[in-house]
């Protein structure tokens, strides 16, 4: 029998994994109560019969695949959304928490290297051949070209060459948009070019001077604030439309402080991310744990303290989580048109929340490695650009993912979160014996705790249900 879920309000629900729906019930099997009204008894008896007839109480084991079709991988490349280029691994800051710094052990050594235009051109030309092929079925596709580092502006010459090269490429139905992540130290030197070429900026800053204590400048005084203000004053329209902020949460700031600082000084709502928990060096775990602060806890703290800034962002964060929950468990969400024509039992899933290779982006490192994204450790290359040629074999990509999925797939089938997983297979740690483990696994004993939290939020704020169903669109 399925374990009932009792919300904090005292209502009882039953979740059916078989048809992926949640049913409100006064109490599981309550119709057998001898003191129940006869009409109520008949109602629940018929309802129970109907549910059993439709396998509501059957436990569903998801149909999971662990092998990608090679044609699927090639199709994703032909319909690519983002090409991310590490233009240099050199940086004019030395941030304590940097994913390429001393806290981590899953990245290549940083040698102040610069990306070569020829390598980028080889990859672009390879992709162009796919974008022009029959595999490209996108309609009016916008491809984001991202410049990553290090500090990308250190190698501005390369950025200009890439933009000039792509601007000369004419492919029907494809438009290029340029994005750059920067610490803003070199911003005044290149701001006119960035404005003229409509480059979108993501500026990294953690708040006030005290909040930025981990963002160590190697030489000279802190000029970031002045540079950002200069951009805002000289190009206000560009600043409004093309500039956003990213802040890293740690033990020297808080969500409240970050939001307050950036909203007050630049009238922007920042993206706030936690410290990267993937690939921490064994001898740095204690230091990492001291620096790490949970975004969820920081938001709760701000709300509890009555922050005037945080109510909106806390609500939005809550809505995002509720939307993901509803998409996963309410049984009425269809992510693609073909999903409308298949029963859930016919849909094949893959373990974890790992993206299909190249479905989101492709990342080229200074070392010539091709990765599925910048967050994946560089011990997992999917291909290379070296010696004047590209080596990207869809069969080898398929085998790598198969190797990663195999040890975890049986665990995923039994996990409560199999439809709502948030971890990438590349992030899964190994135990002392080298076996892959998942720290987020939830078994049947956790069903009440997990479901009741979200259900209670919807009980308490029924308006959110309507807002999420009719107003919120999260991709």
Where are these regions (language model features)?
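Flexible mid-to-C-terminal extensions adjoining Fe-S/redox cofactors in radical SAM and related proteins
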Residues: 6-11, 352, 369, 375-475
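N-terminal [4Fe-4S]-dependent radical SAM core
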Residues: 2-24, 42-84, 102, 133-139
């Amino acid at each position: 029998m399925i374990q009932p879920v009792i919300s904090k309000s005292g209502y009882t629900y039953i979740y059916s994994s078989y048809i992926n729906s949640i049913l409100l019930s006064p109490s599981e099997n309550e119709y057998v109560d001898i003191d129940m009204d006869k009409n109520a008894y008949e109602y629940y008896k018929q309802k129970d019969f109907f549910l059993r007839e439709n396998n509501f109480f059957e436990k569903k084991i998801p149909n999971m695949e662990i092998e990608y079709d090679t044609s699927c991988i090639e199709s994703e490349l032909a319909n690519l959304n983002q090409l991310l280029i590490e233009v240099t691994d050199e940086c004019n800051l030395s941030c304590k928490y940097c994913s390429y710094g001393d806290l981590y052990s899953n990245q290549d050594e940083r040698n102040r290297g610069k990306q070569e235009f020829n390598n980028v051109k080889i990859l672009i030309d390879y992709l162009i051949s796919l974008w022009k092929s029959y595999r490209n079925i996108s309609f009016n596709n916008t491809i984001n070209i991202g410049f990553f580092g290090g500090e990308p502006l250190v190698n501005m010459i390369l950025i200009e060459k890439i933009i000039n090269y792509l601007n000369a490429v004419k492919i029907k139905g494809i438009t290029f948009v340029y994005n750059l992540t920067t610490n803003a130290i070199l911003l005044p030197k290149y701001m006119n070019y960035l404005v003229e070429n409509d480059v979108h900026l993501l500026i990294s800053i953690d708040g006030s001077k005290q909040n930025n204590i981990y963002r160590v400048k190697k030489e000279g005084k802190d000029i970031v604030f002045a540079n950002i203000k200069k951009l805002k004053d000289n190009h206000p329209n560009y600043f409004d439309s093309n500039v956003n902020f990213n802040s890293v949460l740690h033990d020297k700031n808080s969500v409240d402080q970050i939001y307050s600082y950036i909203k007050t000084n630049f009238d922007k709502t920042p993206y706030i991310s936690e410290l990267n928990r993937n690939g921490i060096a064994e001898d740095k775990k204690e230091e990492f744990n001291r620096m790490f602060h949970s975004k969820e806890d920081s938001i709760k703290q701000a709300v509890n303290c009555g922050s005037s800034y945080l109510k909106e962002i806390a609500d939005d964060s809550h809505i995002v989580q509720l939307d993901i929950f509803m998409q996963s468990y309410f049984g009425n969400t269809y992510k693609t048109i073909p999903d409308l024509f298949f029963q859930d039992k016919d849909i094949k899933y893959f373990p974890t929340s790992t993206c299909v290779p190249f479905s989101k982006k492709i990342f080229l490192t200074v070392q010539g490695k091709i990765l599925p994204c910048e967050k994946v450790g560089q011990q997992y290359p999917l291909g290379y650009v070296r010696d004047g040629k590209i080596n990207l074999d869809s069969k080898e990509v398929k085998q790598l993912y198969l190797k990663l999925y195999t040890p975890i797939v049986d665990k995923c089938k039994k996990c409560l979160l199999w439809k709502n997983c948030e971890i990438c297979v590349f992030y899964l740690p190994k135990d002392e014996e080298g076996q892959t483990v998942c720290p987020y696994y939830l078994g049947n004993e956790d069903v009440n705790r997990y479901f009741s939290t979200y259900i209670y939020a919807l009980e308490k704020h029924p308006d959110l249900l309507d807002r999420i169903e009719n107003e919120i669109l999260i991709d």
